[in-house]
Amino acid sequence: MDRELIEICKENSATAFSVGYQIVYLIYVVLSVTSIFTCSYFIKTFIWNSTFHPNFKLLLTMYFFAAIFHSFLFTASYLMMIERFLDYQTDCDIHVSMVPYAIVHSSIACCLFCGMLTQVFMVIERLLATIKIESYEHNTSFWHILAYLFFCIVLPLSLLVWAYQDADYNSPVITAISPPKGVEIRLNILYIFCFFLAILALILLQVVRFVNKRRESRIEISLSGRFQIVENIDTTTFISSILIINMIMSVIYIVGTFTLRNFQFDAFINNQPALATVKTIFYLHPLFSFLMPLISSYHLSKMRERRVKRREHLMAIKTKGREGSDAYNQLLHDQWTQHFLK
């Protein structure tokens, strides 16, 4: 065994047994386990029982399933580390085996990029719903579903094959979330590409929301079109919150890891455990998976409340006699006024 590998083994062993590193990792594991249940509950309660368009339901389900699988795999990566503790005799025994490492790490990367691209296609789907406002409610087919599955699963897999073509899974690592040697440059390109794609998606989402808000008071739109407009406004607000939070955490991760990789800090000189602990803190995906169903539940609950209030308001309007006539005339007056103000 060469001297360089011995030094790596000592550093990695010291990191794995570091109290700070274990506390951070364990906190993220708790968040991951919790998010498995909260995301599953959200899918069952808020997605499958919703009145959303089938295409949007599919993309939203895929997005939350990607978060569930990531949380499951992140927990598995910690269990792999615990397994190495049980067999620990020398410093190099702390490194995870190649095959489990390759399987878990590749799957984690796939979940992350599937989630990133799925949120972009949720924006594209809302754009199509805005363009085909009168017919989109009844516009779904097997080919649409197949296309979304292709772009949200096959495309991320193809990008990962490109990024990991020179991956060395024999790299000595203590956790499956650490990328292998040979992928840093291409992986950074993918992260930056997905980040700027998310910025463009957020800008497009605001344009879609603005267009739907402008259409909301137009009197010539059919009942089906009005329903689609209201759904577009509600869902774009909901997606915006997810995109913004994801972008904030992506910025923290990208800037944090770039800074640690390219600049030296006195606190981390000859202190590999502290450096590894801070890098793990910047890996905010478990925190995002934990917050996402909570924030999404809040937005969709508010959406339901608004729909109930609109329905109660309509039911409270008088429909007979002089009061009914006055109420109807007032509704027409309000609609015409809003229409010509546009």
Curated annotation (Swiss-Prot):
It comes from the Eukaryota. Residues 44-61, 124-141, 209-237, 296-342 are cytoplasmic. Expressed throughout the nervous system, in pharyngeal muscle, hermaphrodite vulval muscles and in the male tail. Not expressed in male somatic gonads or sperm. Disruption phenotype: Reduced brood size, which is in part due to an abnormal distribution of male-derived sperm in the hermaphrodite uterus following mating, with sperm moving at a reduced velocity, reversing course frequently and accumulating at the spermathecal-uterine valve 1 hour following mating. No visible defects in oogenesis. It is found in: Cell membrane; Perikaryon; Cell projection, Dendrite. Disulfide bonds: none annotated. GO terms for cellular component: dendrite; perikaryon; plasma membrane. GO terms for molecular function: G protein-coupled receptor activity. Coiled coil: none annotated. The chain crosses the membrane at residues 23-43, 62-82, 103-123, 142-162, 188-208, 238-258, 275-295. The keyword Phosphoprotein does not apply. The keyword Nucleus does not apply. Its main location: membrane. Belongs to the nematode receptor-like protein srb family. G-protein coupled receptor. Plays a role in the navigational capacity of sperm and promotes the targeting of sperm derived from males to the fertilization site in the uterus of hermaphrodites. PANTHER family: SERPENTINE RECEPTOR CLASS BETA-1-RELATED-RELATED (PTHR31216), SERPENTINE RECEPTOR CLASS BETA-16-RELATED (PTHR31216:SF11). This is Serpentine receptor class beta-16. The gene is srb-16.
